[in-house]
Structures are given as C-alpha cells and as structure tokens.
C-alpha cells in the first residue's frame, strides 16, 4: 500500500497521525487559537472553515489561512468546510462549497482539502483533479452522526472514494451499540487488507467508539483526531493522552 507524504509527514506507516481541528469564528480568534495550538503535540492541523463567520468574503477566509500557515509553517494544513448535512456549522450551496475549496487550492496556502463524497460525483471528480493539478492532497470524507451502516456499505463508500482518486478516504460514524463499533473496526480491517491501495481514516464516534480512535494501527486507520481545546466531534480525547496511548500501542 502506498503512503501519502505531506511536507515531511508520511501518512500510512507507523503509529496513526494525530489531526487537531481549529474552530474559530473570526480573524482575531484564528490568530489567538493558532498561537495556543502551536505548543500542542500533533501532526496535522485541520482548519474547520465552517466555524468561520465571514465565509462570503473569500479574502477574509484566505487571510485567516495565511495566519495559520505563517504561525505553524511546518504543519500540514487541512482545509475543511464541513457541510451542515454532515455535522457542520453552516449550510452553503454546492456551488459555493466547490468555489470555496477551489479558492483554497488556488491560494497555495493549504496542503490538503477535505471533500465530502456525497457532494455530487461530477463535482467531486473535477475538484480532485483540480487539487492534484495544484499539488494539493484530498481527504475524501463521509460522516453520519446518527448511525453506523453495515460493513459492506462502509467498505463500498471507502472504495468509491478510492475510485474517485482521493488521496485518503475517511469515514466517521455514530455507533448505537458496541456492536456498531465492531462493525466499523471489521470494515476497516477488511478494507485495509483486501481493497485499500492508500491510507484510510476511520472512526466510530462518541464515548462508545473511543477505542476506534486509539487502535487504528491494529485495524488499519492511518490517522485519528484529538482535541487541543474543544473537541470537534464526540469522543475525541486530548492530544497528550492520545499520543501516549498511540505510542504505547506502537511500541508494544
């Protein structure tokens, strides 16, 4: 299986990489949060742009991205607008969503974008090609904050992302039971062993699913999300605790 290298970070080998999400409403908060995050132990900075209030002003959005890039130049920057239908803070049209991601790609400030699988097949394929033409990696994602589908469906979604040439397919699901967590882990393992030719990221959310955020190296998930301050999804634990557990499992 091939790995994905962003800056000096190799994703898909060794212990799962830690992603943290920065969620700030304006430029001032982006700046202060960035300074606080700079001291934390993580691998990839995700900027959750759906929390940013001044979305209609692309210049303002890119000014914020520039602050993040300049504050943490060594960290890979993942640009993510999480749609309202997949748990995000704001609802925008598909056209606006694609335009925002293209603006991020054009800016030269971001290393990766998050592109939701169910945005529309043609738009997704075109945006992946556009990102790759500008040397930007694509994390293709799907989130369900209500349920966990059958393993076959989880695998089908991850394989579809791979067929659309996502650099890293990602899925996050809400368990209704511990069995749902096992379903997610079994699907991850089957995908990783039988179909994946690139790194994947999977997680089961909430307290019930915490084990999935810790055991990625065992089952085949290449990265996990931790919290510096406020968690961006239910079930995230602090980056310091997360790094400790990931290191213990890696060295065992």
From Swiss-Prot:
It comes from Escherichia coli (strain 55989 / EAEC). PANTHER family: 3-DEHYDROQUINATE DEHYDRATASE. GO terms for biological process: 3,4-dihydroxybenzoate biosynthetic process; amino acid biosynthetic process; aromatic amino acid family biosynthetic process; chorismate biosynthetic process. The keyword Ligase does not apply. It is an enzyme of class 4 (lyase). Pathway: Metabolic intermediate biosynthesis; chorismate biosynthesis; chorismate from D-erythrose 4-phosphate and phosphoenolpyruvate: step 3/7. Belongs to the type-I 3-dehydroquinase family. One of its GO terms (molecular function) is 3-dehydroquinate dehydratase activity. This is 3-dehydroquinate dehydratase. The active site is at 143 (proton donor/acceptor), 170 (schiff-base intermediate with substrate). It catalyses: 3-dehydroquinate = 3-dehydroshikimate + H2O.
């Amino acid at each position: 299986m091939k790995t994905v290298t962003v800056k000096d970070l190799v994703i898909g080998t060794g212990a799962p990489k830690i992603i943290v999400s920065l969620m700030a409403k304006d430029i001032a908060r982006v700046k202060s949060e960035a300074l606080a995050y700079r001291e934390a132990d993580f691998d990839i900075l995700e900027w959750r742009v759906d929390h940013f209030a001044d979305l209609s002003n692309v210049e303002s959005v890119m000014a914020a991205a520039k602050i993040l890039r300049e504050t943490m130049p060594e960290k890979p920057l993942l640009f993510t607008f999480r749609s309202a239908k997949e748990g995000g803070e704001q609802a925008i049209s598909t056209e606006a969503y694609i335009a925002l991601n293209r603006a991020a790609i054009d800016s030269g400030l971001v290393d990766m974008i998050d592109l939701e699988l169910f945005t529309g097949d043609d738009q997704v394929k075109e945006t992946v090609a556009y990102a790759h033409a500008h040397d930007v990696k694509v994390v293709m994602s799907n989130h369900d904050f209500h349920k966990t589908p059958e393993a076959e469906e989880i695998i089908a979604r991850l394989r579809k992302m791979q067929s659309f040439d996502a650099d890293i397919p990602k899925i996050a699901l809400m368990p209704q039971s511990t069995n749902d967590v096992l379903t997610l882990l079994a699907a991850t393992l089957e995908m990783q062993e039988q179909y994946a030719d690139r790194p994947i990221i999977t997680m089961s959310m909430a307290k019930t699913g915490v084990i999935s955020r810790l055991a990625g190296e065992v089952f085949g998930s290449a990265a996990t999300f931790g919290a510096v301050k406020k968690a961006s999804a239910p079930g995230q634990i602090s980056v310091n605790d997360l790094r400790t557990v990931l290191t213990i499992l890696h060295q065992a």
